[in-house]
């Protein structure tokens, strides 16, 4: 391999013309840019890596809406929703501890859009003898408000005991809930960046107006992928909700398409 030369040809030249128009016409290139976001597009298709320290989560790039979910038609803000994700990233909930955050996201996978519908920061009194049980009550209130029956709980660390506590609290309230356990092993900054940045930079991350004055906005403004910039518990929970497999939404009474195998063959 001595004396080799490296050939680099970005998908677009300096004038914006495609290098291989028969394979990658302008329309397809724009679709790729919208799909993966600016950072991945520049690195993979333009061969220009964006330094991590230059990446930010600008709350001004959020598309705000003021509407509630229409369960009868599975619609939100004029769009048909295909799935939802309710996610709880827990902590002790004490005032000086990491934030304990519950998130609800709706998804329109046809348009590759996500709708950040509500974020609840859970805080319990420092003198509360049962802070985890109290938080479970708060999460059940959150679920009741949004007519939810299932939630994912991050079970790293303190969350390991929460599914059973949650079931006990729900049983006492006569609530029937389904709990999905989530274990995160990826670096937190990478997880946040990969989940949020592509949607945010392509105008496909929507947020309810109730969140405009929430701590989430300050977290986004102060966040850096280099870490150690302050609180990021809300955006970490949002990233978890975006990366989990969503629960499929169907309007009440919608028929489920049957699938049947063709067994009319000979061996």
Give names to the regions the model predicted.
Residues 227-243:
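Charged alpha-helix within mobile-element recombinases
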Residues 242-267:
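Acidic two-metal-ion nuclease catalytic site recognized across multiple nuclease folds
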Residues 77-80, 93-98, 231:
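A short catalytic or substrate-binding loop motif that flags glycine-/basic-rich loops and adjacent residues
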